[in-house]
């Protein structure tokens, strides 16, 4: 199986990090910039431009791809399941939780466009013409779409367009260029995509499970402690855990009191308060560790 991943840019490093955490360590090859083997002999990596990855998957050069939803939607259809996918659609298998951004419709702050309907008969400049046309159809506004390849935010100020559809993460670039958001067009993040015929492939399912286990571990910590057996119910009340804590008998303490070892998965944000509560009910030897993967 071949996975297409971004070869550079802001998505490259977090994607490689995800592969590593999922257990797909990449091996050095003679042509590392084009492809790489992994520790799994049945899985290899293809490095490509983020915008080209959807076509690599559609054409069969890769079996699955990791890229932004904006790139996949611009290149063609995207479906939530194989049964809902058309012949040329990609199936959105998993939101990988990084690379979040929005495609927005924006216009000059001091201009005549304050709502979408004001754009009727006007012109929109964008690097995403297909998404923009689909959006205009959805909102039933007739406007021309001009395709540009960069500096989209400048086009309204040089009378090239009345508004733009562009990517924003923080909104800073729009504010600097005195542009106001009129409407949200698309919420995007990095996703795992596959062709419909690959959704039920055993290796694809294995990779999907590995990625899901990484995401499930994010924001969680593993707690281990010893506690008096007689106060176990109090400990359980403090840390219900993921499906309940794991409890094991251990040797009695120096006074002969029965003890148990308690292990639980907790939310990272709760660790600070949880430790104080655990100590108050007699827990000792509390250990907090990171979780690399959590398989449900």
Curated annotation (Swiss-Prot):
Q: What is its main location?
A: cytoplasm
Pathway(s) per entry: Amino-acid biosynthesis; L-histidine biosynthesis; L-histidine from 5-phospho-alpha-D-ribose 1-diphosphate: step 1/9
Q: What does the entry list under GO cellular component?
A: cytoplasm
Q: Which GO terms describe its biological process?
A: L-histidine biosynthetic process
> Which family does the record assign?
Belongs to the ATP phosphoribosyltransferase family. Long subfamily.
The EC code for this enzyme is 2.4.2.17
Q: Which reaction does it catalyse?
A: 1-(5-phospho-beta-D-ribosyl)-ATP + diphosphate = 5-phospho-alpha-D-ribose 1-diphosphate + ATP
Q: Where is this protein localized, as stated in its record? A: Cytoplasm
Q: Which NCBIfam families match?
A: hisG, HisG_C-term
SUPFAM superfamilies for the chain: GlnB-like, Periplasmic binding protein-like II
Instruction: Offer an example of a GO molecular function term for this protein.
Output: ATP binding
Sorted keywords for this record are: Amino-acid biosynthesis, ATP-binding, Cytoplasm, Glycosyltransferase, Histidine biosynthesis, Magnesium, Metal-binding, Nucleotide-binding, Transferase
So which cofactors does this thing need? Mg(2+)
Known role: Catalyzes the condensation of ATP and 5-phosphoribose 1-diphosphate to form N'-(5'-phosphoribosyl)-ATP (PR-ATP). Has a crucial role in the pathway because the rate of histidine biosynthesis seems to be controlled primarily by regulation of HisG enzymatic activity.
- Its protein name is ATP phosphoribosyltransferase
InterPro entries linked:
ATP-PRT_HisG_long (IPR020621), ATP_PRibTrfase_cat (IPR013820), ATP_PRibTrfase_CS (IPR018198), ATP_PRibTrfase_HisG (IPR001348), HisG_C (IPR013115), N-reg_PII-like_a/b (IPR011322), N-reg_PII/ATP_PRibTrfase_C (IPR015867)
Question: Out of the domains of life, which is the source?
Answer: Archaea
Question: Would the keyword Transcription regulation be found if you checked this record's keyword annotation?
Answer: no
Organism name: Halorubrum lacusprofundi (strain ATCC 49239 / DSM 5036 / JCM 8891 / ACAM 34)
Control of this protein's activity: Feedback inhibited by histidine.
Q: Which PANTHER family match?
A: ATP PHOSPHORIBOSYLTRANSFERASE, ATP PHOSPHORIBOSYLTRANSFERASE ATP-PRTASE
Q: What is the lineage of its organism?
A: Archaea, Methanobacteriati, Methanobacteriota, Stenosarchaea group, Halobacteria
